[in-house]
Amino acid sequence: MNKEKKYWMNKDEITVGEPVVGPADLQTTSTEWNRRDFLKTAGFSLAAFMTACSKTPVNKAIPFLIQPEEIIPGKAYWYSSTSHACGSGCGVLVKNRDSRPIKLEGNPDHPASQGGLCPVCQASVIELYDSKRIYNPQIFRQDSTWAALDSFVLKNLNKTRKQGKKIVLLTETITSPSNKFYIKKFLKKYANASHVEYDPISYSAILDAHEVNYGTRFLPQYDFEKADMILSLDADFLGTWLSPTQFTKDYRKNRNLDSKHISKHIQVESRLSVTGAKADERIVKSPAEMLQLVKDIENTLQSNGEHGIATKIAKALKHYKGKSLVISGVNDIGIQILVNRINKSLGNIGKTVLHNNPSFQKGGSDNAVSQLLTDMESGNVGALLIAGVNPVYDLPEGESFGEYMKTIPTKISFSGKQNETAELCNVICPLPHYLESWSDDEFTSGILSMTQPTIQVLGDTRTFRKSIGGWTGYEDGERNLIRNYWKKIYTTRKKGSQSFNRWWDNLVHDGFVMIKPKSVSVGRFKKGQLEKTLAKNGLVLVAYPSLQMLDGRHAENPWLQELPDPISKLTWDNAANLSPKKAKELGVSQSDVIQVKANGKSVELPVYIQEGQSDDVVAVSLGYGRKGTERFKNLGPDWIQKKATLAEGELVGERINHLLERKENILSYSGVSVSISKTGKTADLALTQTYNTLKNPENTAPPSMKVRPFIQETTFEAYKKDPSSGAHRGHQVVTLWKDDHPYEKHHWGMAIDLGACTGCSACVISCQVENNVPVVGKDEVFRRRDMAWMRIDRYYSGEGTDVDVAFQPMLCQHCDNSPCEPVCPVLATVHSSEGLNQQIYNRCVGTRFCANNCPYKVRRFNWFDYAHDDELENMVLNPDVTVRSRGVMEKCSMCIQRIQEAKIEAKAKGIPLADGDIKLACQQSCPADAITFGDLNDPESDISKLVEDPRHYHVLEELNARPTVGYLTMVRNREDENEGGHHG
């Protein structure tokens, strides 16, 4: 790479030797203290000093009267199931302790998850223990019984049928075959009933485009493993688009550096996404330019002239004909038709674009929703049943939808939570969490996934299937409703000659079975007519699902609210992202509040200045401003300033769905013309990366560089010539003695592949769930007091729209020469006999000397006793990990509880501990398999081999802390640049 290339975190990052100051509101401007504030501060200081002297309360265990056969107290057991948190249908393994689920891991055998899991699925376990869920059936907002509710519903449905008005069942895409069966029976019973599906994040344009081109409305499956050339047009397939976990797994398989070839990835987008950050080449185009670019690519493929950058892309696609893949995340039918044409002309159909086993994840129709709005406005709807969606929040016409609902006599909500739509319904059928219910789902044709209860139902809830089935005469238990359906039809879908009982047992035990794919009828390809251009010129809105909130259904999840956005590092909020050039042009700075107006509607948002974004775009994430987030008003400690996380009645972030518009009835997320005006107000942005915490002293840098970079990278061409290219080695450390501490048994170490890491943050949430890391609230994050043991540092290189991005997971480096250990006055931080830097909580008195002396800034201090008042929510805590108290320092423990468990199990079996027996929480969840952990004393272990890899290096190695966590140089597949040599 270029010798002068430098990665940076923020424009205003501090320089070496410059003092570090806190946020503006923490800088005292007056020396006058009143007596009350002084006593509060003095009291806190004394309490922090004395916290290590307090006794742990005694909690007595109550034994089982009759112990279940499968439960051994204190030992985890696992269930195979399926996640319903993000809609990807990943297979999961549910870890239970004493009859309560506490952790999810990806099922390594399931084709969708392949052992990985996204952060949303990881965090969904806490929603099971949400005390604010709806736990009883309700009629007119009063708790009732299911018998009374069923009687009320049937009476009103029959009344609606006699009146000749429509009964509309409005749902998200139904992926359950048995649910489809019972819905079909419901529609047959009520001849005036219809079923409308829509997806809160619409994919309608892809389905509609396939109907234009192939005569059938369907969503194909995409095979990234077989794609040697990937062109992604605003499709964040490594972040939130369709099946990011599966796509990440497959994407990484075709980027194996041991092979002679790795896939080439070009990303065209208007905002900086997770996928764009990992692309080999990234091209910034506004929504107005996107359609023209795709047209130019198609014309170039047909040898119709030169079209600038489109010609370069077309040549690359043509070079990998039949092994390329073109996708688009733009919900515009014109672009999707062009994408279909290009894939067809390149011969990708049946190779990387699969029609024989399509995806059933998304099947919603925006056209059907538009028709429903018309019917509701005209008063033709007499009963509305809503399941899995929140149209009052989701739709641009949400306010009108709510008004129309008031005129409908019978409104039934199937929801586990109170939301904007449920509160307008006169009947609420509370749904159980997916971890306490049965379900069958075919997210992808040919893969039948099973969801099974992993805990006794916590309330008087029942599934959508149970309600609809019961109202059509199918009275049975949840399990039998599914089992009886498959018993009738399994012979038409099963593979092999198994009996039904054996087939069913395998389905429940494994969490999935492979069945005969349900193909779609694909007609001859038709070119189709293009729709109008995507957008007008000028400033436009780009609305996108954030990696944390998606469509907003998880807005009440505190773990996801406090999870930093992978790119902006913003928590507890959404913002108006503007390019530096546009912000300067508008005269606004970061944290200024602006008014964004579109189609006569407006919203006020704080400004976030985002590198790598189109100058013609204001990008805002969806999923915020959701009802239910007012619960976080008092989240966080009662600090001296009495500053609440939220104002009274305030929601987290702002809803922007009302700014969207429909084009040809299809919901458009890109290209809505907007205007911006200043409000004169500012807002606090709770960012987790507000200055550069890692600094390399200039005098330790190689002669050719000002500082040695902690992000080291190279190109694939340079790597093939010299595997050590891009690695800037430190000087040989001069020492007066040999290794002063031999590790006789195990010496644990870790390596993280920067080329694999996508920044998805699955590891961050997995670590938080596994290790009982507390949520501190927006105010404390703003004060730089977040508690995450694992953080993902995001670095930029370049200026304006032409920036490269790198992600670097940063955790305790477990140094063999740890700077934190000798400064602790009470030996609370010590070195284990196996090379781990350990924190002894009951010794710690909170001097924070260790945090001050840590060059990696990975230690976290408990400034307060963070709330654990909700007894139901406390059920999610891992009993193997101590819940830390105020005044105690904490950090990554390298999942010592998992290490000890594996060692004990191996000893009990009388076998040696094998490489791979121990999987750390972050490692196990990573969809990209970027993290490797093992024993450095075992020369045959994967970690030992990676340490000898020429790509391996340590961050700040010149400080001689001798970390056991190393990194592998990032490799991009792009044209070779002037490669800087390494320094040995």
Question: For each predicted feature, which ranges?
Answer:
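Long, low-complexity segments enriched in small/aliphatic residues
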Residues: 488-568
